[in-house]
Design a protein with these regions (language model features):
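Membrane-embedded beta-barrel scaffold of Gram-negative outer-membrane proteins
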Residues: 115, 209-213, 219-237, 378, ...
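Surface-exposed extracellular loop regions of Gram-negative outer-membrane beta-barrel proteins
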Residues: 169-187, 288-295, 301, 345-354, ...
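Gram-negative outer-membrane beta-barrel transporters
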Residues: 264-267, 272, 331, 343, ...
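Conserved C-terminal beta-signal and adjacent last beta-strands/turns
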Residues: 164, 323-325, 387, 423, ...
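Short acidic/polar hinge/loop motifs at secondary-structure boundaries
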Residues: 35-61
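N-terminal periplasmic accessory domains that precede
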Residues: 11-15, 28-32, 45-47, 59, ...
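Face-selective signature of the C-terminal outer-membrane beta-barrel domain
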Residues: 158-164, 200-353, 378, 429, ...
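Transmembrane beta-barrel wall of Gram-negative outer-membrane proteins
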Residues: 97-130, 135-173, 198-215, 259, ...
């Protein structure tokens, strides 16, 4: 769901996991070229991903995503381009509604075909994005740089080096009430402007991936990464609230340093004549966070950093050994099974201690066994069916532990990890040049972590007892001829509380807020290698509950987009001129909801009809 709020990053939900996140990614794990884009505590973001360098994206849903460890209700693997011969330079410029610009450059190439010792491939890109924003007080700018370098060390080993850096400055327009949205979806609440709600993010990260074939049947893989992330956020919390005893102020200043290593060994063999592959490994991640809070005012001047109200150092680490196996039981029947033992430790040291704000230091440690298994049967060469089951584990993030409800001071150490059990039945069928998929699933969760309340940009969390998700997914990706492609997907997801999450009132049987019951997409594209191309897509989302009581809902919507362009191939040059219209019929709809917003400002409106045009020019040195 697109919040249209660059201060809070993109929200992604997989089978309802991630829907509670008020900023960034939550409940799912994301990897870019094998390096986590999810912090060790489970909080992720997409701001450091260069969309112009993406080669493909794979999404893993269902029980086996749990084998990736903590916060893996789903897994998204992003693979960026690998440089190839010939060397290519590319420049692109894009302009859209609301004063939006994106300019980028990219260079890629290789010194060989990657099979000989000393062969090198590279992809380097940089981009700048600026926008005034659809709503008032929603301007943003982002500078992004990425580099990927691959080296063939010898006949049996390769090394990939990765680097990225991002700087984001964004105003935060916050949410609106239903009346405000209907009167003027572009407006903001008065406090947002008074306190100049905004966020600044600086992140730098580097990683390496070493792969070696130890023998005909053995492979070694080592992934290492390290990074730092600095975040400063000014919230629109009223002055009187910030002055309460124990309240941590209206400015959040975070400094995070994180690193990790994942080492795995893969062995292929036969056991009792059954071909089997074993993969064993150890994953270690750690993060140190310095969290400070300040008043968002200085005297009568609002929207500036004032007196300190919080100062703590948080340390978390996780250590996860794991084993995965793949058994080819017969020509048609295969079994995948694995287990992971996840240990997550959290420790907080409070350095801001006063008579009215006592020492809130504390620690927590969580352990869980995470088994998963899947049985796959090949009905024929183009059709298979499978059944799978597994257990998932999701600990609170540092942010979720940082705030308690009802203006209480200190850490939310009563927040417990959520555990889930998932079963799934599905099938995949190749139809000509297309793929038809179907899946039914059920996920039962205990101690699900959900939003308790949200106030002026600050959210506290609670455990919701038991929840259940039942769903059906259908998908079709069909190629017609050489240039036509049709994609369609539909998800029916019934996500409900099974025990009380509303305090004195009963929420048993209520829908979990933030999750749509029906989601559908269809897209048709005509895309030859050169000349004219065009496409259209339709998205539907049913209504979404915005609070635990289900008293408030964001209405359903259907939006249509169209795009077209022309691509020239002239000797070594490629020119691509393109344009797009989103929300073609100018629907007034809600792009995202802020769950349990205490002031009734649940709604984050989406833009009306908007336009974009662009040009990409590349030159290949042949």
């Amino acid at each position: 769901m697109n919040r249209q709020n660059y201060a809070q990053d993109l929200q992604i939900s997989v089978r309802g996991f991630g829907s509670r996140s008020t900023f960034g990614l939550r409940g799912i794990r994301m990897y870019v070229d094998g390096i986590p884009a999810t912090m060790p505590d489970g909080q992720g973001q997409t701001s450091n991903i260069d969309i112009g360098s993406i080669d493909h994206i794979d999404v893993l849903r269902g029980p086996f995503s749990a084998l990736y460890g903590n916060s893996s209700g789903g897994v998204i693997n992003v693979e960026t381009e690998t440089g190839q011969q010939p060397t290519t330079l590319e420049a692109s410029s894009w302009y859209g509604s609301y004063g939006s610009w994106r300019n980028s450059v990219k260079a890629s190439g290789a010194t060989g075909d990657g099979t000989q010792a000393g062969d090198v491939n590279y992809t380097v890109s940089a981009s700048r994005f600026t926008t005034h924003g659809f709503r008032d007080h929603s301007s943003a700018q982002k500078n992004l740089g990425n580099a990927k370098l691959g080296v063939r060390i010898d006949d049996v080993s390769t090394l990939t080096l990765l680097f990225n850096s991002v700087h984001v400055e964004a105003q935060d327009p916050g949410g609106l009430t239903a009346e405000q949205w209907k009167n003027n979806p572009r407006q903001v609440a008065s406090n947002v402007s008074l306190y100049d709600a905004r966020k600044t993010v600086d992140q730098t990260q580097a990683g390496l991936h070493y792969q070696r074939q130890m023998s005909e049947n053995d492979d070694l893989s080592v992934m290492m990464y390290a990074g730092e992330r600095e975040t400063t956020q000014y919230q629109s919390i009223p002055k009187a609230t910030q002055l309460r005893a124990g309240y941590p102020g209206g400015v959040i200043a975070l400094s995070r340093h994180y690193q990790g290593i994942d080492t795995r060994w893969t062995h292929r063999d036969a056991l009792f004549t059954i071909p089997v592959t074993f993969t064993g490994g150890l994953d270690y991640e750690t993060m140190t966070e310095k969290r400070k809070g300040y008043q968002n005012f200085n005297g009568d001047e609002l929207g500036v950093q004032g007196e300190m109200r919080r100062n703590e150092r948080n340390l978390m680490w996780n250590l996860d050994p794991y084993l995965q196996t793949a058994w080819q039981l017969t020509d048609k029947l295969s079994l995948d099974a694995g287990v992971r033992f996840s240990t997550v430790n959290f420790d907080s040291n409070d350095y801001y201690v006063t008579d009215s704000d006592p020492d809130d230091s504390g620690n927590r440690r969580y352990h869980r066994w995470l088994p998963a298994a899947a049985l796959n049967y090949a009905i024929d060469n183009s059709w298979n069916a499978y059944v799978s089951a597994g257990r998932g584990f999701e600990t609170p993030t540092l942010n979720e532990l940082s705030y308690r409800a009802a203006d209480q001071a200190g850490l939310n150490l009563n927040l417990q990890p959520a555990t889930s059990e998932t079963v799934e039945l599905g099938s995949k069928k190749r139809i000509g040049n297309g793929l038809l998929t179907a899946a039914m699933f059920q996920t039962d969760t205990k101690n699900e972590i959900v939003s308790d309340s949200s106030f002026e940009g600050r959210t506290s969390y609670k455990n919701a007892g038991e929840t259940r998700r039942r769903g059906l997914e259908l998908g079709l990706d069909q190629q017609f001829g050489e240039s036509w492609r049709f994609k369609a997907a539909w998800t029916l997801l019934d996500a409900r509380y099974r025990s009380n999450a509303c305090g004195t009132e009963s929420c048993d049987g209520n829908r979990i807020p933030g999750i749509a019951r029906n989601m559908a997409y269809a897209g048709l594209a005509y895309a030859p290698d050169q000349g004219w191309y065009a496409g259209t897509d339709v998205r539907y989302l049913s209504d979404i509950a915005a609070d635990d009581e289900n008293d408030v809902k964001a209405p359903s919507y259907t939006v249509v987009g169209v795009n077209s362009g022309y691509k020239w191939l002239v000797q070594n040059w490629t020119l691509d001129l393109f344009g797009r219209v989103d929300n073609l019929f100018d629907r007034n709809y809600i792009g995202s909801v802020i769950v349990n917003e205490s002031n009734g400002r649940y709604y984050e409106p989406a833009p009306g009809r908007n336009y974009s045009v662009g040009l990409t020019v590349s030159y290949a040195f042949q």
